[in-house]
Amino acid sequence: MINIRKTHPLMKTINNAFIDLPTPSNISSWWNFGSLLGLCLIMQILTGLFLAMHYTPDTTTAFSSVAHICRDVNYGWIIRYLHANGASMFFICLYAHVGRSLYYGSYTFQETWNIGVILLFTVMATAFVGYVLPWGQMSFWGATVITNLLSAIPYIGTTLVEWIWGGFSVDKATLTRFFAFHFILPFIILTLAAVHLLFLHETGSNNPTGIPSNMDKIPFHPYYTIKDILGALLLILALLTLTLFAPDLLGEPDNYTPANPLSTPTHIKPEWYFLFAYAILRSVPNKLGGVLALLLSILILLFIPLLHTSKQRSMMFRPFSQFFFWLLIADFLTLTWIGSQPVEYPYMTVGQLASILYFLLILVLMPMAGLIENKLLKW
């Protein structure tokens, strides 16, 4: 009997992507984050759908509707906190996934990498518009400050900002359109993720050594399905622990105060996952310069395949590059911490130094390390 899994048009596609997919036999747990991101996305879409059933995108009722979800809707509190903390888990997985690709040279799959960077941008945009929806103080002022950055664009800046706002300030029109964006973007992310996977399956997965593994492949199922299930269970455990024991740990107390355009919070800051970029933005004294630095902090990822100088793909056997990679991780964490601190003497200077180091590492030091290691191979 012919196996339906291999003949049915739809089943065949699923089979080739998740069941009989030839996979390197030596990929480590760092390769789990792709499936975890898929799981996060599905969880966010489902919890978001249930929240949208009770939420009202209107300035007068938005804050109350979120309170209503938490107090009056059956299990509304857990749906709301799973959604909020699910976003944090999403970004932890995203940064781990990008870090893995940087370390093991997966960025040499250029189409996959470029779509991945576009995905990162889209997820960041989704998280930003989503943060505005509860209409608390930090929602309102975060939206005001970040959208206002576009006014730094010469000539069209002010017009562009007012066009995005739908008026002369962040108001009802802004909230309504942000809700519309927040609803549609996850489905765009879903489509992009499918394309990301399509390009990845054209080449097959990379592995920790960075050496082609065509002579040693194993089927994805059962080996990696079971491994992914373990990863998923650990992710769900972490998410549930965070949600049930410390749901507001990563949140902002200011967001429990309804939005008030007449009172500015003492320290406006985004969610933790944007703090590194926010620190880079604040490090530049010039407004347009800051906006460009902010954009470049993520866009720089697109240039990484062009900056690869080493004859080896992975950093597994490259100690100099490893040193600079971990320095970059430490710098990323430093920037994240600086972004949460007030704009005053020691933090400002540390932030500026960390921002310079961030770009210096990616653009100069890591490519140089690759060249030195090439020389050492001959020596």
Swiss-Prot record:
Entry's transmembrane regions: 33-53, 77-98, 113-133, 178-198, 226-246, 288-308, 320-340, 347-367
Binding site for heme b b566: H97, H196
Keyword set, alphabetical order: Electron transport, Heme, Iron, Membrane, Metal-binding, Mitochondrion, Mitochondrion inner membrane, Respiratory chain, Transmembrane, Transmembrane helix, Transport, Ubiquinone
Binding positions for heme b b562 per the UniProt entry: H83, H182
Entry keyword annotation includes Cytoplasm: no
GO MF, one example: ubiquinol-cytochrome-c reductase activity
GO biological processes: mitochondrial electron transport, ubiquinol to cytochrome c
Pfam families, alphabetized: Cytochrom_B_C, Cytochrome_B
Record-level GO cellular component terms: mitochondrial inner membrane; respiratory chain complex III
Residues reported to bind a ubiquinone: H201
Cofactor note: Binds 2 heme b groups non-covalently.
Keyword check for Zinc-finger: no
Subcellular location: Mitochondrion inner membrane
Origin superkingdom: Eukaryota
Principal place of residence: mitochondrion
UniProt topology in membrane: Multi-pass membrane protein
Described function: Component of the ubiquinol-cytochrome c reductase complex (complex III or cytochrome b-c1 complex) that is part of the mitochondrial respiratory chain. The b-c1 complex mediates electron transfer from ubiquinol to cytochrome c. Contributes to the generation of a proton gradient across the mitochondrial membrane that is then used for ATP synthesis.
Additional remarks: Heme 1 (or BL or b562) is low-potential and absorbs at about 562 nm, and heme 2 (or BH or b566) is high-potential and absorbs at about 566 nm.
Record note on quaternary structure: The cytochrome bc1 complex contains 11 subunits: 3 respiratory subunits (MT-CYB, CYC1 and UQCRFS1), 2 core proteins (UQCRC1 and UQCRC2) and 6 low-molecular weight proteins (UQCRH/QCR6, UQCRB/QCR7, UQCRQ/QCR8, UQCR10/QCR9, UQCR11/QCR10 and a cleavage product of UQCRFS1). This cytochrome bc1 complex then forms a dimer.
Listed name of the protein: Cytochrome b
Organism: Berardius bairdii (Baird's beaked whale)
